[in-house]
């Protein structure tokens, strides 16, 4: 059972996101709001996404376009190029055009409460996609992979990978987190630290830089250049003679940036975690460099979102699997959570057997 209370305090201090409760509600028909009477099958649906910083966002764009078209909806898929004001304007335009549902992958989950309220007042259902929208009473649903579990899987993979290379510690590690304005970043980090902190406390893990708090390890904008710059500084300051055994990286883009930095310092590549199953990182895993990634199949996430849209169109409540954990600061948002899968070289063929692209990469 998760230590939700502790995590809630940490999240509230950073972004007012709290994970409350301690357990799951596995009902398929949760208490979401909105669209009780349904809407026309050819209604306008708005999809507001952040930016194409990773392959999963680009893939989501095409999957949404194809899925909405096949279902008969009028669609509008917009990227905000990671600009908060641009996304706010895009959502407002979707409201003006009469969107029945607006699916939002937030640039900054704490900056959309006014737009969400306007959507609600106009009769639209709001679904937070992948990233929870914070401090907004009118968010109807949240659909995502279980991001706390993602962090747990990453933390355990880091320990397993280092143990496989060197049976006993202590191990020298450095920690990276995602962008502070992404509500998921803190959840990933707290999930990982629920696994790693006991090992830090008992001396199994050593952090030479001393940088172990979320605020010290974030990577603005999830940008590779920011991660590489920090990794360069860490290598120069702390690992001119010492060996770095592992790096907790929250996604594949930052993982590859960290690896590039370590190689530039002419040091052995440590165990490095990741997420998103990007092609280049899967290749790196198969080549024995990056140790792990997380398979959060974007096709399944978009499919789950489309199923929710179809239910709402018919006047039914959308599928919900959790009604306790995701408190956005002002309400518990009914969530439809999917299960992430850890991937290493050992299980890559099985994990990607049904992926038309990655199944070829791992052969």
Report the location of each language-model feature.
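C-terminal motif of bacterial Sec signal peptides marking the signal peptidase cleavage site
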Residues: 16-21
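Hydrophobic helical h-region of N-terminal Sec-dependent signal peptides
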Residues: 10-15
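A residue-level marker of the well-folded mature domains of exported/periplasmic proteins
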Residues: 2-6, 22-363
């Amino acid at each position: 059972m998760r230590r939700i209370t502790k995590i809630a305090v940490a999240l509230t201090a950073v972004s007012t996101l709290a994970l409350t409760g301690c357990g799951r509600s596995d009902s398929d028909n949760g208490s979401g709001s909105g669209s009780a009477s349904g809407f026309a099958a050819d209604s306008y649906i708005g999809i507001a996404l952040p930016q194409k910083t990773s392959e999963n966002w680009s893939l989501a764009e095409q999957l949404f376009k194809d899925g909405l078209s096949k279902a008969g909806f009028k669609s509008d898929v917009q990227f905000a190029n990671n600009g908060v004001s641009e996304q706010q304007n895009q959502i407002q335009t979707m409201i003006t055009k009469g969107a029945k549902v607006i699916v939002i992958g937030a640039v900054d989950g704490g900056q959309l409460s006014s737009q969400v309220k306007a959507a609600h007042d106009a009769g639209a259902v709001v679904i937070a996609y992948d990233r929870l929208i914070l401090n907004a009473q009118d968010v109807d649903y949240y659909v995502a992979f279980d991001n706390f579990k993602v962090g747990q899987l990453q933390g355990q993979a880091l320990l397993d990978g280092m143990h496989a290379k060197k049976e006993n510690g202590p191990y020298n590690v450095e920690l990276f987190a995602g962008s502070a304005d992404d509500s998921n970043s803190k959840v990933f980090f707290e999930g990982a630290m629920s696994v790693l902190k006991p090992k830090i406390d008992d001396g199994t893990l050593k952090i030479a830089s001393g940088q172990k708090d979320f605020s010290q390890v974030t990577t603005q904008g999830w940008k590779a250049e920011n991660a590489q710059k920090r990794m360069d500084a860490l290598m120069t300051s702390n690992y001119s003679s010492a060996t770095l055994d592992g790096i907790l990286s929250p996604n594949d883009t930052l993982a590859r940036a960290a690896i590039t930095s370590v190689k530039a310092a002419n040091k052995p590549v440590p165990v490095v975690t990741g997420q998103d199953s990007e092609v280049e990182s899967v290749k790196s895993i198969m080549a024995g460099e990056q140790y792990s990634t997380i398979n959060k199949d974007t096709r399944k996430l978009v499919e789950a979102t489309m199923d929710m849209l179809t239910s709402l169109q018919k006047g039914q409540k959308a599928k919900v699997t959790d009604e306790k954990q995701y408190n956005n600061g002002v309400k518990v948002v009914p969530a439809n959570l999917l299960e992430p899968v850890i991937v290493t070289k050992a299980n890559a063929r099985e994990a990607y057997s049904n992926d038309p692209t990655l199944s070829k990469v791992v052969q």
